[in-house]
Structure formats: C-alpha cells, structure tokens
Amino acid sequence: MDYQELVEEATRQISSGVFLVSGQQANPMTIGWAQWGCIWGKPVLTVMVRHSRYSHSLLEDGRFTVSVPAPGGMKEELKVCGTKSGRDVDKKTLLSLKTVPAKKNGIPGIAGCAIHFECKTLLKTEVSMEDLEPELYQRFYNGATQATPDGDPHTLYFGEILAAYRETK
C-alpha cells in the first residue's frame, strides 16, 4: 500500500464528498471536510460531525470507516447520504448500497468506492465557538442560518488509520 498516494487521491476527492460510515448497521453519511496527517506518531484521519447528525451518536463507539468514491463517481449516492438522515431512512437499502468487509475495525466500507480508510478514535473534541475565528463562526455556525440556536457545532474525531487500501474488484 502506498499510503501517501491514497491520501493524495482522497484529498482531491473530499470537496466532492466521501462517505463516513459508522455504527453496527454501517450508516453512511456524506462529508466534505477531513484532514489526514501524522499525530502522536500515528497516521490520523480527522473527521467533523455536527451534534445534530445521527452519525454523531454512532461515532461514540470509537470506530469509523471513510470510503472514497472514484473521481466523479457515486454522485447520486453522495447526494442522498448528505441529505437524508439514518434516523429516518435506511440509506443502504434505499440506494441498494453494498458493503465491503472491514479488515481491522469492524466497520465495513461502501462497495464501489476506490479507497477505504478504517479508523479507531484516539480523541474527540468539540469546536469551541468562543475560540473560533469570527469569520468562520459567521460563515458556518451563525445561529440564524443553522437549525439549532447554538449553531450546531462540530465534534472532531481524530481516528488512527488502522487500514488504508484500494478496493479490489
């Protein structure tokens, strides 16, 4: 596995959306923000999830998988997984999504994706509204534009990458 190559490809794709998969039922959610790096001498993938999202509670078990579609791929699936909640609908059934078995963390990936990152949470921390740069607060957390009065802050989940691989057909 050329880890750096996988990270570079995933980084190019993140703005178009990738799947964050969590929970025993492998609930997929579309995310557009993530960060890859080395922290505490470990390869780490950091994802951000708002408190209001169904996936937020699922991430409490300390494991997640990020599945990265090929460039331009799975657009409809990403759209649905970014607009529908797993509280209300089984997105895997709705979209006829299949999964690929996990290799290390027990959380499968979404089949048909190019790359999968399996992670275990090392740390979770809340975005501090008081410490956030004011322009970012106004743009992403201003209570007037959010569904909740507190601006629906994110939790950052720092996940040690236990496995990173291309999907084989």
What are these regions (language model features)?
Residues 1-31, 35-169:
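Active-site-proximal mixed secondary-structure blocks
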